[in-house]
Each structure stands twice: as structure tokens, then as C-alpha cells.
């Protein structure tokens, strides 16, 4: 057969195929750029696409067609699929090839509700007017530090109660790296009984079914919003066929919510132990931690602490994988998070089947948020009765509230389930600020609606807001002026 005939497409009659590939072509330099930047194994793993995009964004400050095309060739994924994935997430800046790349430093001004109340628009304008041309100023969604508004991120470092002078000083000193908090270290955690229960599990000194019963009796429910009973969820997942997986939803993206960040930056090993205990109970071979990219401090030190666990063989039963979110609000929804963990756009899945049946990579998956597993060790140490004995107005357990707005003492408040907003403000927050009147509050984030002050006696807990057609998210309570 002649060469010209060999290029004829089947079924295309006498039309000849093009003697070159259609579409954008990769260049050798861009291929080399990515090979030097991205671990080789990422190119063979579909679920590492978003992390690969992160590495390009981190290094070049944007995504340009030449690198997306090179990534397509290296991963053997269609360029359209890579572009659709990248364009879905707010933290990826897609530029045209001939566009000037963004400045080395980006200032992000939080425009969340509490930051709006504390003058973020004026702050953004003043910063835009005062910084040099090699710095860009953009608005960004809630950064999870609402009790210290307004918040500004310079590079990867967050400044709370920010003003122009603070930001200018950071620019002058190139103070743009995240601050690692003074959290409880592995050694200090172990000195206070940490990982004893997990070690007992690893050595088969614990009965997984008894641990499930203890969690069921405690009444602990999923604290990411859905409120599904934790012990029952463990039982359901354990009953499914192996292999099973676990996923942690650390994408604390509901505006006004910052409780997970609070716990992680103070006692990360309590979270990690609870996570590994839950994984052991359901016999999960792997656990995937999905952490929001807005928490660079947590991302940095949590990776370090996970390495310590690996050195101590505390993950001998369960491999730990760490993934970054990319600024998609919808990925707080569990099935959207699973799609994102698989390296795809975070589009919600139809249910059923539920993740406990068909979850990550099609396997039965136990999904918890950060705070839920944070309570596991304490409940197993002190007993189910200890946890369930707390509560007001007929409710059981403890709840963590992210309180911000016009209160004297905003912040994370641990209170009995069923407390009312009036009690929470008066007894835990020191009351309303001078010169302000309590007018309304958001009991469950931006998706949960606004309640007027006259409804200040409603118990704040699961199932208490449904008759008002409100959604309970995760206790991000704010006062509206």
C-alpha cells in the first residue's frame, strides 16, 4: 500500500488524513519544564491531575496553554479534559500564551460576610491604590478566619485584623510564607495518652464491633452538616465488600466556618488518631485527606506530622494520602469531593448509590469531616455516656460553634448541643458589642438562610431548623448588624 493510501481514515472514502496531529502541539521545552517540576508517577495517575495543576500554578503563578498541552501529552489525557478540570477551580489562573504572567506576589482580600462587615471593600480599594505594579490585588472567598476580620492573604501568609500598613510592611519584608502555629507536637501528644487506643487497635486488643457500639451510644453525628450518626455509618461501611476506603473532608468552605482550622492548628494528632481509629474499624486500606488550599499553614505542618506517623508505623494498617482542594465551594459536598479526589471537576454525583456503597474509585468509602473524627479518641476514653450527658433543650452531645460578627468575644465556642443563639451570645461571647443591636443571625452558613433576632430561642442543633425551611450546615454562627 502506498504511503498516501495508508493515511486514509476508515470509512472516510477518498479523504486523506492530515499528515500531522490536529490541535495544539506540545513543545520540547514545556515537556521538560513539567518533567522537572512534577514527579514522574503523577503522570500515570489520573487522580493526581489536580495536584499536578497545583504544582504548575505554584511555580509559574498561572496556567498557560503550552504547559496544559504538555501535561496532556505526558498524562495521555485529552487537552479538553485538562482544560475543563483546570477552569472549574477558582485557584487556577488560566492565561493565554501571549498574556503577561501575573506578578510574583498576589494580595487576596477576603470578601466573606464578616470581612464585608469590617470594611473589606474599602481595604481592597486602598491596597489597589497603594501597591506597586508588580503586585496584584484580588478579592477572594472566605478564608476561615472570620473572628479576626478583615483578613488579607499576602502570598501564602494570612494577616488578620489587617490594614494597609500591615500589608505594606509584609511586602517590604517579603513576609509571604505561612506561619506554622504552636500546636501540640507528636511527643507531647503521646505523653498525654495519645495513640494508646490506636496502638491497641493495631495490636488487635480492641473489638471493632464494640467500638461501633460505643460510638452509636454516644450519639455523635457527622459534624460536617448532614448529621448522620457516626457509629451507624461505621457499621454500614464495614458491612460492604472489600477493599474499602476512607476520605476526610477538610474543605471547610462554608462562609463563616473556621472550627476545623481551629482544631487542626492546636491539636492535629487528636484528629489524626481519630481518623486512623475509624479507618481501622472499617478496615479501610487507604485514607485520603482533602484539605482546602486556603489553609497553607495546615497543609505544611500536617504533611510533616503524617511523615512522623509513617516513621512510627502508626499507619501500618492504612496508607495516608494528602490532597489539596482548589477553591471550589461545591467540593464541600461529599460526592463532589470524591470527584475532585479522582482528579476531576467537582460535580455532585447522583444518589443512590451512596458513598458507603460506591464511593472513591468505585469502592465503599467512609467519609467524615475533620471535627467528627476529632472527637473519636475522647469519646472512646471517657465513654459514650460522657458525651451524651451534655446537651440542652432535649438535645445530646457537644457542638462547636464558629461565632463572628458584632459580638464582644468572637471565636470558636464549645457548647452543649441545643443551646440557643441568645445563650451562646450572652454566656459564651460576652454579649453584643457596644453601640450595636442584635438584629439577625446565620445559623448554618450562607446556604442556611438568615433568622431574625426574634427567633433567638431556637435550639441550635440538627433537625431543629427544618420546620423553618433552613439547612443546618456546621454551626458557623454570625450576627448581622
Positions of predicted regions on the chain:
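Local cysteine-cluster metal-coordination motifs and their immediate loop/turn environment
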Residues: 51-54, 81-91, 101-122, 138-157, ...
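Terminal amphipathic helices with adjacent charged low-complexity linkers/tails
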Residues: 291-299, 304, 436-440, 445-460
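Histidine-anchored nucleotide/phosphate-binding helix
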Residues: 89, 267-281
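Single conserved hydrophobic/aromatic residue that forms the stacking wall/gate
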Residues: 471-481
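Iron-sulfur (Fe-S) cluster-binding modules
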Residues: 1-65, 69-74, 79-84, 88, ...
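Conserved phosphate/anionic-ligand binding catalytic regions in large, soluble enzymes, centered on
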Residues: 216-235, 327-339
